[in-house]
Amino acid sequence: MEITVLIRVYDRIDDLKYNLQIIRDTWKDNNYHVIVVSNGKSKGYDIPSDSLRHIDKLVVLEENAGHRKGNSQLLMEGAKFIPESSQFTLILEADTWVYGDAIISKYAKRLAETPNAVWASADWYDKYYALATDFALIKTDYIRKHPGIFDFELFPECHITNFLRDTNSDFIWITENMPVHVPSYISYKYPYVPNIKEGRFYVFPKSKTVTHHIEFLKDGIEQKKGYFNIVSDTDYFPEAKISAKAWNRFKMRFWIGLTKCFVKRSWYSKKTYKEIEE
């Protein structure tokens, strides 16, 4: 299967370096065309030369559209370079590392078998219909017909579901990457939620994914490498060997799974579509 991987990056250059290595080393089920779009050049965040050999197309934007529009800018510019032969496009944050591509193959097959579904990613909010954009698989033909899917500022996850609704298109949840957040009333601390203000999990052992912002980890990227070894059940990063990986994965699954027992708004109130002010 022909799949384009559209990776966007601003300043997470080290994350990108390791992500590209992981893709080339462990994603073997499909034919991948890797596009990297960067908007950090004006601030000195250049793509290192040793990463270039893992990139099929590098798009460097001279200017950054800013905090509200930067993410949209990267996706819209990168989408211009998706090959005609690509059946699916995976949009990926530079700091989202996935061991192996079984999860991609699974949801590409499901999308192919579901005619009206064009997007697959995790459910983002409990209150609103919203879809994750850090790891999302999309039918490429839909992007070509509807480039506005990436034209957003605030609440990109809500924009996606609103846009799909308005174009009479469906989505599939990637349940292996759920739940993303703990309930908002968990305000002190929770295992595997390094930044309680965000209230977000950064490890997903079912999909063999880690997506940490390394500034939230005490030991930075070395700790992230250790988490990656745990979820992948490998010593992919030999410098960050972890013992008792199975026990650590059990703890991840337990604490993530436990949140399904916590009272949530969706238990007593239906999800709604968020009205986004332009």
Task: Name each model feature, range by range.
Residues 158-278:
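C-terminal catalytic/acceptor-binding lobe
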Residues 86-97:
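Short beta-strand-to-loop acidic/aromatic patch adjacent to the donor-nucleotide binding site
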Residues 12-26:
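Short, well-formed alpha-helical segments that are part of the catalytic scaffolds
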Residues 44-86:
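Active-site-proximal specificity loops/subdomain of glycosyltransferases
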Residues 3-12:
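A conserved hydrophobic helix/loop-capping motif in glycosyltransferases and polysaccharide synthases
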Residues 31-41, 60-63:
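Short beta-strand/loop segment that forms part of the nucleotide-sugar
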Residues 14-16, 41-47:
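Short, charged/polar "capping" segments at the starts of alpha-helices
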Residues 97-166:
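Conserved catalytic core of nucleotide-sugar-dependent glycosyltransferases
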